[in-house]
UniProtKB/Swiss-Prot annotation:
GO cellular component: cytoplasm
GO BP of this protein: cell division; cell wall organization; peptidoglycan biosynthetic process; regulation of cell shape
Superkingdom of the organism of origin: Bacteria
EC number(s) given by UniProt: 6.3.2.13
Protein name (Swiss-Prot/TrEMBL): UDP-N-acetylmuramoyl-L-alanyl-D-glutamate--2,6-diaminopimelate ligase
GO molecular function: ATP binding; magnesium ion binding; UDP-N-acetylmuramoylalanyl-D-glutamate-2,6-diaminopimelate ligase activity
InterPro entries the record matches: Mur-like_cat_sf (IPR036565), Mur_ligase_C (IPR004101), Mur_ligase_C_dom_sf (IPR036615), Mur_ligase_cen (IPR013221), Mur_ligase_N (IPR000713), MurE/MurF_N (IPR035911), UDP-N-AcMur-Glu-dNH2Pim_ligase (IPR005761)
Protein source organism: Chlamydia felis (strain Fe/C-56)
HAMAP family: MurE
PANTHER family assigned to the protein according to its UniProt record, in alphabetical order: MUR LIGASE FAMILY MEMBER (PTHR23135), UDP-N-ACETYLMURAMOYL-L-ALANYL-D-GLUTAMATE--2,6-DIAMINOPIMELATE LIGASE MURE HOMOLOG, CHLOROPLASTIC (PTHR23135:SF4)
Alphabetical list of SUPFAM superfamilies matching this protein: MurD-like peptide ligases, catalytic domain, MurD-like peptide ligases, peptide-binding domain, MurE/MurF N-terminal domain
Binding site for UDP-N-acetyl-alpha-D-muramoyl-L-alanyl-D-glutamate: S32, T153, T154, S180, R188
Residue numbers covered by motif Meso-diaminopimelate recognition motif: 405-408
Cell compartment(s), UniProt: Cytoplasm
Gene name as annotated: murE
Length: 485
């Protein structure tokens, strides 16, 4: 596609400076370091740096146009200037990659917790039902044979559209996307045409980014506002906000749940260390179901995935129930470590609600006389209001070993002290070094205890103010256990 074609009929408020020639566009990018001839440079202003400061370098490296919110009279190339830069970026990216979402069945999952598990479950079921799918999410982006880890739950528009286009090129027929509230607010998902929207749950998170809980909910509502009247709005009907989300969309409502009446409802729940058994009720029929994923919150995740697949693909419900028995949890989601002297789990839980769900689940698995030992911290430069609450959650269920998560720009000791201010009882220990914290937790555990290492899950790094180091909770656990042999 050439520059003239790309800019033709763009309906975002934008002004073009310079002569538009039919020169071929090679790429859309925000990285001035990797610019080549034929690229369009998008000069975004971020928290840490301003892309406009690198526009001249981008032009020197071969950029044929610059997209920005600020006109630069010293640039010798075409400039596309708009006050709605994020929407303009989304529209240009979608057009450049030939609107790939129109060629896929696109499922968007939003919610404070559960997005990753639900997205992996849907991909698993879609693939099993001959609907080969890609995935864009927190752990990785799966684009056919290509797997990418870039650290973004919801990538920026240029990358997101590029990934969707790669799925089309790889002959995939569906895309499952984790849609974060931040990604929605920053318009990263604008010009993605969703066929299905899924709501897992809504609890406190990201209040460092959103002004209030109401604004956080409003952000998530955007996904459902994007659905057409032929789409599906799949909502957890046990949520207080369920009605609000269903009223915000033109799409066909589909509900799931445990406590309230729903299109897909679980009853007669039984839990064990080997998973959950329940009766799935749909239109008066009962389907006995076994899931290897433990905990009530994972029953909700399974229900969401079944509802989406059954409604969208019209698969046999009994077939889906049978498939669920062989699902596997995503990496770092209540992931068991098999070689320990007691049960050890790695989990990504980093919000009060997620931590409560995981601790509650694991406590039910404790043998008589056993205790739950929880290693956890809180991320730096993130919502500080949840730090005390995290301590209060863990205190309900067991012994806490408070440590560092990803301190980022904050002092680790300050974060730990803020967490510990939430404890009422002195049933905790402090080990700021995360490896030492894991070592200590394992050293005090008996064979009747359960150890939970929470907060980082699948992550293989730890972020400090001046450096990011390699750090994998699973590897550290194995290293500590091997030292006992």
């Amino acid at each position: 596609m050439n520059l003239k074609e790309l800019l033709h009929n763009i309906d975002i408020d934008a002004k073009v400076y310079g002569k538009i020639s039919p020169i071929e566009v090679r790429n859309l990018t925000k990285d001035s370091r990797n610019i080549g001839f034929g690229d369009i440079f998008i000069a975004n202003k971020g928290k840490r740096c301003d892309g406009n400061d690198f526009a001249s370098l981008a032009v020197e490296n071969g950029a044929i146009a610059v997209v920005s919110s600020i006109y630069n009279p010293f640039l010798s190339v075409v400039q596309i200037i708009s006050p709605n830069l994020s929407l303009l970026e989304a529209q240009l990216a979608a057009k450049y990659y030939n609107y790939p979402s129109r060629k896929l069945c696109v499922v968007g999952i939003t919610g404070t917790n559960g997005k990753t598990t639900v997205s992996h479950l849907i991909k698993f079921l879609f693939d099993a039902c001959d609907k080969p799918s890609g995935l864009i999410g927190t752990i990785e982006h799966i684009l056919g044979n290509n797997r990418i880890q870039d650290g973004f739950t919801t990538p920026e528009s240029c990358l997101l559209q590029k990934y969707l286009a790669e799925m089309v090129k790889s002959n995939l027929t569906a895309a499952v996307i984790e849609t974060s509230s931040i990604g929605l607010v920053l318009d990263r998902l604008a010009n993605v045409e969703f066929d299905v929207g899924v709501l897992t749950n809504v609890t406190l998170d990201h209040l460092d980014f959103h002004d209030s809980f109401e604004e956080y909910i409003k952000a998530k509502l955007q996904l459902f506002a994007q659905l057409s009247d032929s789409g599906l709005a799949v909502v957890n009907n046990d949520l207080p906000q369920a009605k609000q989300f269903l009223e915000a969309t033109r799409a066909v409502p589909v509900t799931y749940g445990i406590e309230q009446l729903a299109d897909y409802r679980a009853s007669n729940l039984r839990f064990s260390p080997f998973g959950a058994d329940f009766d799935l009720i749909h239109k008066g029929e009962i389907f006995p179901c076994h899931s290897p994923l433990i905990g009530q919150y994972n029953v909700y995740n399974v229900l969401a995935a079944i509802a989406v697949t059954h409604q969208r693909l019209n698969c046999d419900l009994q077939q889906l129930v049978s498939l669920v028995a062989s699902v596997k949890s995503p990496r770092g989601r209540l992931e068991p470590i098999q070689s320990g002297p007691c049960p050890i789990y790695i989990d990504y839980a980093h919000t009060p609600d997620a931590l409560d769900n995981v601790c509650q689940t694991l406590r039910t698995l404790l043998p008589s006389g056993g205790k739950l030992i929880v290693v956890f911290g809180c991320g730096g430069d993130r919502d500080r209001s949840k730090r005390k609450i995290m301590a209060q959650v863990v205190e309900k269920y067991g012994f806490a070993v408070v440590t560092s998560d990803n301190p980022r720009g904050e002092d680790p000791e300050t974060i730990v002290n803020e967490i510990c201010s939430g404890f009422v009882k002195r049933n905790f220990s402090i080990e700021i070094d995360r490896k030492q914290a894991i070592t200590y937790a394992l050293s005090i555990a008996s064979d009747r205890d359960i150890v939970l290492v929470a907060g980082k899950g699948h992550e293989t790094y730890q972020i400090f103010k001046h450096q990011t180091i390699a750090f994998d909770d699973r590897e550290v656990v194995h290293e500590v256990l091997s030292s006992y042999v």
